[in-house]
Amino acid sequence: MRSTFLLAISLLLGLISSAQTPCESGFAGIYPCSGYDLQSRLTMAQIGGGSGNDIWGWTSSTGREFAIMGRSSGTSFVEITNPAFPVYLGNLPSHTSNSTWRDIKVHNDHAYIVSEASGHGMQVFELSRLLTVTSPPVTFTEDAHYAGFGSAHNIVIDEASGYAYGVGTNTFSGGLHFVNIQNPAVPVAAGGFSEDGYTHDAQVVVYNGPDAAYVG
């Protein structure tokens, strides 16, 4: 019995090891590479299905690492602390309908998720919940929701001030939509900017240069 168990373990380890693909002659399997190996791969079907368009990440205070994948029907969470053994933890379904576009940013251990799905708004998910998943995969629920806009192409966060900026929303002519996220449980509308029209993406910083008229 013991020898059978050891044989099974050996076969399993052999299968797992085969998932790691070394970078040889500029390729790790079918993927171009330069000085790094392919540690593992999960298909879209293995992490909730549909198509994917955005990926972000989060590292816990204890050093555990997670990938956050925006998909057409929801958001997937995958632990990648050991990159050779990724674990699909679960899915946060779309707040409304499916959409090709779903984007994520992370601030203070929370994920902020927007989509071009009509009426979707901004989902808020407390990432520390990932640390206690014991029987994956699970279906998550959002911890908070902001409905000040419906659809949005992307979201930008200024970590210094604790403000999020929806871009390409159905408000402010598609310009910047400001949201105070200093309390992630209660996102608060803080205005917007429409003079430049539709904004596809952005980077937000607090100006601290020589021109006093623009400081702050």
Where are these predicted regions, by residue range?
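Positively charged n-region of N-terminal signal peptides that target proteins for export
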Residues: 1-4
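Bacterial N-terminal signal peptides
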Residues: 6-14
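Feature marking well-ordered beta-strand scaffolds used for ligand recognition
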Residues: 19-216
